[in-house]
Amino acid sequence: MEWLVKKSHYVKKRACHVLVLCDSGGSLKMIAEANSMILLSPGDILSPLQDAQYCINREKHQTLKIVDARCYSCDEWQRLTRKPS
């Protein structure tokens, strides 16, 4: 299943991206943590490869690995993206 990036936040301290992903129909929304050397932007499309790897915008040489995923909640998004005090 392809995923559309709706929101993207890079967590420098953990060196990972936190993403809000939506399926093509817009009915399924997830929060995913991913490892990637490439910055992701809203509107990017993630296409599945294998072993939790995805290519970015159907470019097979631009990949990321999903390390954690969960159902979307506003509280969880705020927790993951807030600045440390």
Swiss-Prot record:
Superkingdom of the source species: Bacteria
Entry's induction text: By PhoP. Repressed by BasR.
InterPro entries: PmrD_dom, PmrD_sf
Gene3D superfamilies: 2.40.50.650
Gene Ontology annotations of biological process type: response to antibiotic
Keywords: Antibiotic resistance
Family: Belongs to the PmrD family.
UniProt function note: Interacts with phosphorylated BasR protein to mediate transcriptional induction of BasR-activated genes to induce polymyxin resistance.
Protein name in UniProt: Signal transduction protein PmrD
Organism listed in the record: Salmonella typhimurium (strain LT2 / SGSC1412 / ATCC 700720)
